[in-house]
């Protein structure tokens, strides 16, 4: 989930991906011993029932082990830490024409062997502060 107007105004994308409620996780935590091969998991995203992303963790640019190895050269990872890897092809912002999420949309993400997460898109409150 990204706040594109914030993302495009600053030199890094971090702020546009760091808003409260914009990093849904779940429906539960799964430990590595429950996953099997982390490089063979189908990842799919639907918006209002339309398949938008269909990929596999084998398509990651860097495999999970290389990501963890690289991150731990500068940071200590603790149990429960989350490593975000990016997103597969199918991002609405780069579709022609673009397909941005709007209030009322329902986003469903499934990762084989891990579960399904489904969330509605909620409108930003009228009184929220904007830069």
Specify the residue positions occupied by each region the protein language model found.
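Catalytic-pocket segment enriched in acidic/His residues
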Residues: 2-131
